[in-house]
């Protein structure tokens, strides 16, 4: 290939270079108005006329990928102002000037210093100018020219993908489109055949072919079967130079997969299947599974199962398991071994998705025979009915037979059966059953008005196998008997005005009856015989199970008779006739002109409920006595004397003890002001304490005396409680108020002891100067240092 490139280069250089002339762009600003032209001569595909110009150019085409050891000559720059004395300097600027292209500033020769690649940059635009060396001014306007890079076939075709993936349905016709591959060539498509790509297949025949110009891959073999071979690898070559010898080429791989079509019917691996199931299997119980195989995949391998014919067409069913594609045989109806022991079915497997163009391959279904054998099971007794409904009159006597139930063993053995009542459904044991024949009879009296329906359960059990039992519901309806008399629907109490007129309606009566006669209720109303004669009221039956009470005379006097009690007889028309007597209370009241009641007799409206006058007086006296007792107790409690705090004949202020062995001064014997202890209000402001070390003499603060009625004991108890609950209380030092000893005291304050410091830090020699009272204390603390020294 390198030899070929050299050949092209030599061929190009050896060609005669025709000359042409063309005007180039000129920049005239800054120059005298003198018309100048440039003359360029060099390589060109067309021969042009030559004319004299200010510039002469020998070459403007370069071959790419030049591999010579010397710089590649581009052309020569010359100005007609150049006299050959070196007074002019040639300058080159533009694309690649000084790097890719250099110019001899004396001769104007231009050379390429590096190997150029047309695919990187096909055209370079440069500018040339001649400058006077002495003045540094241009002698010609700057002119622009172009260097074009000629293409050579140095790039092979490259596919857009290294590996292609494609699919095509199996059994496709010849020429079915599969995929299109594309390769690109970086060479110049406008120059020669360097970029003209031709496709060919290197691997994959005779199954596939490729169009040389488009790169479209098509099927080349008829009826390719996925079940025989699914994957194909095809290698495609793209070659430039129109596929001629010496062209560059590239390859790509195309992985082609045949997709499935439904071209295979399902097939049972065997023609006959046999299963067993007990006769006690409930509907929906699976018996067995059958499976047909299909060489296809996906939805083309889906199978539907159905029972097409056979003795058990109505007794069994088949459903399809969508995950395993199996047919599940299930029980459709209850089986009976005693009736039929063996069933034969024909099960068919078919594809739900069939392509019509493959029907010529045959029917896409298969069938198999399934034999089902029913196994005998010891079954519980079976009642002749699913439920029983019986009736009985509510006046039936005990042990009256209502009806019977029947059950028998369905097995061939015909085991005997006994009957019983489930007592959970008959807690009151109202009914009983004959265990031998199933007769139902009463064991207690019935009442329809208490319970109309009795729902009980009867159990039938095999005598030889008590585990085998069955149940049946029994509904017993109690028939009505006219055994309840009618009665008022409510308690009737009404009134009549004193000025009422005769035949005036004062009350409408209604009745109810607990019985439920077949023809409905029909009540009749009348006054009791003892009240029918001489009554001040009459009753009128409305023939609609209601009646009205009317006045018989004009005017009533409530002072003579305030209340009338009317006995009313209510009867039904059923058999036997039942009747009852109800009382209607009629009160005589004063009414206004519109007939509205205003007032009745006190006994008629208000019952004397409450306490008598004597009882009220007694209760009032008890309350007064209790109040007096409470008042006296409170007064005595307030006047009770308080115990003294200190029982002493001495003055409470004499709390400074006088010693006879040492005369005290006036300040020692003078009683101090006790107001400090008896003024809690003054001390209340200084409850918060701060622990400090006293640094100066404590000056006692005089507090005015407290009020005489201040209880000192209560104050001391209060202070004691506060100190007990105060977390800042001693043993550590704090400012406190002590009894004032006078200004002449040797120990200014107890705080001067500074008990917070350690014994080693104290000098107790001054205790011996305090006098005989502190002699013992001075001996105790004064010997500490001597003990340590010893």
Swiss-Prot record:
Membrane topology summary: Single-pass type I membrane protein
GO biological process assignments: adherens junction organization; calcium-dependent cell-cell adhesion via plasma membrane cell adhesion molecules; cell migration; cell morphogenesis; cell-cell adhesion mediated by cadherin; cell-cell junction assembly; homophilic cell adhesion via plasma membrane adhesion molecules; Notch signaling pathway
Propeptide: 19-53
Family annotation (SMART domains): CA
Glycosylation sites: 255, 399, 437, 455, 536
UniProt keyword annotations, A-Z: Calcium, Cell adhesion, Cell membrane, Cleavage on pair of basic residues, Glycoprotein, Membrane, Metal-binding, Phosphoprotein, Repeat, Signal, Transmembrane, Transmembrane helix
Recorded GO CC terms: adherens junction; catenin complex; glutamatergic synapse; nucleoplasm
Role, per record: Cadherins are calcium-dependent cell adhesion proteins. They preferentially interact with themselves in a homophilic manner in connecting cells; cadherins may thus contribute to the sorting of heterogeneous cell types.
Name of this chain's protein: Cadherin-6
Organism in which the protein naturally occurs: Bos taurus (Bovine)
